Amino acid sequence: MAAEHNPNADIEALSYEEAREQLVAVVGKLEAGGASLEDSLALWERGEALARRCEEWLEGARKRLAAARNQAGPES
């Protein structure tokens, strides 16, 4: 049995900025319309994966900021 190709496998390697830029492009294509149902579903799935990647980056940034604040200690 052949392994299925994941068209969204490249997303894990994207920076936040790259993922966000691609997400904006996907949303634009979906809003423009004109794509077939199959293409629209593929775009939607990619958009969901890109949004998850952005959330992962943002959550990582929140954790790093919290850790930095904890290391700095109370300022007051």
UniProtKB/Swiss-Prot annotation:
Keywords: Cytoplasm, Exonuclease, Hydrolase, Nuclease. GO terms for molecular function: exodeoxyribonuclease VII activity. The keyword Hydrolase applies. InterPro entries: Exonuc_VII_S (IPR003761), Exonuc_VII_ssu_sf (IPR037004). SUPFAM superfamilies: XseB-like. It comes from the Bacteria. Its EC number is 3.1.11.6. Pfam families: Exonuc_VII_S (PF02609). GO terms for cellular component: cytosol; exodeoxyribonuclease VII complex. GO terms for biological process: DNA catabolic process. It catalyses: Exonucleolytic cleavage in either 5'- to 3'- or 3'- to 5'-direction to yield nucleoside 5'-phosphates. Disulfide bonds: none annotated. The keyword Nuclease applies. Its main location: cytoplasm. It is found in: Cytoplasm. Heterooligomer composed of large and small subunits. Bidirectionally degrades single-stranded DNA into large acid-insoluble oligonucleotides, which are then degraded further into small acid-soluble oligonucleotides. Belongs to the XseB family. This is Exodeoxyribonuclease 7 small subunit. It comes from Arthrobacter sp. (strain FB24). The lineage of its organism: Bacteria, Bacillati, Actinomycetota, Actinomycetes, Micrococcales.
